[in-house]
Structures are given as C-alpha cells and as structure tokens.
UniProtKB/Swiss-Prot annotation:
Amino-acid biosynthesis listed as a keyword: no
Record protein name field: Putative cysteine ligase BshC
Coiled coil: 460-483
NCBIfam families: thiol_BshC
Family assignment from sequence similarity: Belongs to the BshC family.
Domain of life: Bacteria
Function summary: Involved in bacillithiol (BSH) biosynthesis. May catalyze the last step of the pathway, the addition of cysteine to glucosamine malate (GlcN-Mal) to generate BSH.
Species in which this protein is naturally found: Bacillus mycoides (strain KBAB4) (Bacillus weihenstephanensis)
Keyword Coiled coil assigned: yes
GO molecular function: ligase activity
Amino acid sequence: MEIKEISVPLQGVVADYMNGKKEIQSCFDYLLTEDAFKQRLHDLREREFFRQDLVTHLLEYNTQLQAGEFTIQNIKALEDENTYVVIAGQQAGLLTGPLYTVHKIISILQLAKEKEESLGVRVVPVFWIAGEDHDMDEINHTFVTKNKKIKKTIFHDRYPKKASASESEFSIEDCRKWVEEIFKTYPETNFTKDVLQFVDDALGKSHTYVDFFAHLITKMFANSGLILVDSHHPALRKLEVPFLQQIISKYKEIQVGLRNQQEVLKELGFKPIIETKTNAVHIFMEIDNERVLLEENQGKFIGKDGVHSFSYEELMEEMERSPERFSNNVVTRPLMQEYVFPTLAFIGGPGELAYWSELQQVFHTAGFQMPPVVPRLTITYMERDTATDLYDLDLQEIDPFLNNIDNLRDNWLSNQIEEPIDERFIEAKKEIMDIHTSLQQFVKKIDPGLNEFAGKNELKINEQIELLEKMLKRNVEKKHEVQLNKFRRLQFALRPLGAPQERVWNVCYYLNQFGLDFVDRVMEQSFSWDGKHHVIKL
C-alpha cells in the first residue's frame, strides 16, 4: 500500500472549521490544539463518572461478542480515573454499511493512540453503535456493480416494524441468501471463501441488526483494542436513568439552547440541519412496539399527536420501572454520550460536525462542555487497474477528486474531434432555421393556408437534424468505446453515483479482493489530521 494526501475543497461548516475561521470555531468549546486537549483533561478531572458500573456492563457486552484480550484490558483501564476515551458512532449498517464506518473506527484508533502518547494518559477507543435508531431504510442495503450499473441491493425483512435496530430481529436464512447475492457480484478470488465464512460466522451468532454489525466489527478489529457499546442495550439504559430524567426536567431549556445556537449559525450564513417542533422533548418512548417521539402539550407529555399522554410523574416512574423503553434523539444522543463516557475527543463526519455546531448551548444547558470535535479521516482506495486507467487517459491522480468525471470524459472526447459537434450543429440549426423562416414568409404570402403545414415542416427538419447529431455522437462514442469505458470504470471506482467512494462502497468488496487482513494493513498507514484526503494505492 502507498498513501498519498491530496487537498480536496471542503464545503459548509467543516470548511470554515478546518480553515480556522474564528466565527465557526467559537461554536465549539475547544480548538484542536495540544493545549486544548490538555485543558479538556483538566475539565474532565473536575467531573465524576460511574466508571465501575460502566466497566461491568462493557465487559459483559464485549465478552459476549468474543472481543480480544486488548479490548478487555482497555475496558478494565476505564476503572482508573486517569483513563479517557476517543469516541465515534454510527448506525448498524448491514455488512458494516458504507466504508466511512470503517474509516471512523480507524480514526478513533489512530487518535486514541496518538493522544495517549502525547498527553501521557491512558486513552481508549470506543465505538458507539446507534442501536436505538429505527430507520431501517438507512441500514438495510448495500451497493454493488451489476450489469455495468450501480445497484442498490436491499435486504427485505419479511417482518418489518418500527422498532430499534437493537430490537429488530431478522431471518438469518434470508440474510444469508442476501449476503450470497452480494458476493455473486464480486469477482471470485483466493479470498472469497474465507470472507464469506467470516461473514457467515458473524451472522450465525446474530439475531438483530446490531448483533450482526457488532460481531462483524469485533472480528474485523479483533486485535485493535476497540471497545463497542450498544446505545440501546437495556443494561446501559439502566445506568442512564438519572440523566434521562434530567433531560425531561430540562427539556424547555434544551429547546431554547438549540434555537439560540441555531440563530447564531444563521447569522453566520449557515442553514441549520436539526429540525424539531418547538414543543419537542427530545426523548423517544417505546409504545406498542413502536418508537414514538414525545412532545409537551399543556403540561402533559404526549405521543402520536395526543394518542398517548403521560404526566411528568408518570414518565419519571416509568423511566425507573422500564428504562429500556426510552431513548435519545439527535439532540440528546451527544449529551448522553458525554454523560456516560469521559470523552477526550469525539470524531465525526462532515455532517455530524455541522449538526454538532448547533448543540453548543444545549451542552451548556446540561452542564457540560462540548468535547473537542475532530473530523474523521477521509480515505479513497485506488486499485491498480484504476491507476492504469488514469495513466492511459493522461489524467493525474488528483483529477477525479477535483473535477466531475463526466466533465473530464466530455472534455477528453471533444479533444478527439477536430471541430466540436455541439457548436457545429447549433450553427447549422440556426442557418437552416433562418432559411426556413424566410421560406415560411414566402409561402404565407402565396398561400396562407399552408402556414400551419410550414410550421410542422420546420419541426420535422429540426427533428431530423437532432437525430443526425445523436447518431453522429453515438458513432463517435462507439469509435472511442475502449477509452470511454475507462472513464466509466473511474466513476464507479472513485466517485460512484457522483459521491465519494467511502459513502457508497462496502468493505466486503475490498476484503474479497485483498484478504481478511485488509483493514489491518490500512491501519498500519500513517495518516494526518490536517483535513486532507487520503488516497491509498493498492
């Protein structure tokens, strides 16, 4: 493997944040300097955490996942008040979801190691699985290449319900068939059998989306020391009850904090991402096997527009009695993460960084400082065939990341023709239409009754010219088919569906191509935190 860093233009909040603009940096409580991390350590030492109870739960959960010894050691280290975490989170996507999930984990492993060395304290990596999420459409699919097209392949659960990913059981046999269909789209390699077995072993131990995800990640990062936490685990929720009750008691202040911070961002020219009703409580409650967002109405807490109604006292009692029925929304999830873990740093993608910028005053309302927010590493893998296509097309490695590949293709094609087709046909149409307009005027003078026919005649001539243009372009493309296919392959490999590779493709393709130790070899690379994009040549 060879790693190359390239500067890719950033957009929105993350661009201003990484470019050091003070206005947006003021929406966060810490800069990304070594002094700021030292200040964060000082601030965390002023707080208390339920470390022993947390360690007991994490040991039980990760042991069930058959986590490696290094992970167990890291969990036990959390008993020590001088141990901190670098944390990131994601939904439990099938087959681990898009590549960026793996890249988030690589990011927390790298940053935890670096900060442990530079700060002289124990720093352990934690990955927060968003098990409370109930939007199955975001996690029930992956993308593959089939018949020279990119296809979204969905796992259709035969018993769908609006439950959380931690509670949504699926048919192992149905999922196994879905996995086999995915792998049929991959080339057969020396690694295919082992990777299929690797996936099937994880699937065989699973009952839910979160189970499958957690077993795969545990096996994939077996020797890394990674700690997993399911945010919707009943045992964890039990530990969270005091803070859940605090959220309910402070929901108005939380909402005001959110609105005020969003106004700050609007004044800076940014459109807020988080959309909530003014009476939102920011807590979900499971009612009749569905996850329902609570709202306040005339002193009552209601769900489904008043179909369900609870008093404040009833909610408090139910939280004590059945804490597993409650979960956080997008606003309170970061707060709960801050309550549970002594967080040295949170790692997020561009979208997360943008929405966290809306939460500063929400954190303050809860009595917290927002942890340092570090943009995750961004990575693209470039296979040898892709590099060869770039060379054959006389393109630089950076070109597909700075330019639309369709535009690169069109520019290349136009350079193969002496005179631009589009321009020549535009001129021809104008010349012919000018002649025809004059002709129509002549016809109208002699026989006005033919005026409508003359207009139709003009349309037919125009259609024939457009048909000729279309056929010419098709023949030109056919003549250069070999080279144009290289542009298509570049698009599929580096910018599938016009998006970054890591937002579309799944890690299993690369495990199948390069072996089960692929992720381990990626983690051996040296990455920088300067916001540059990392291209790894395979």
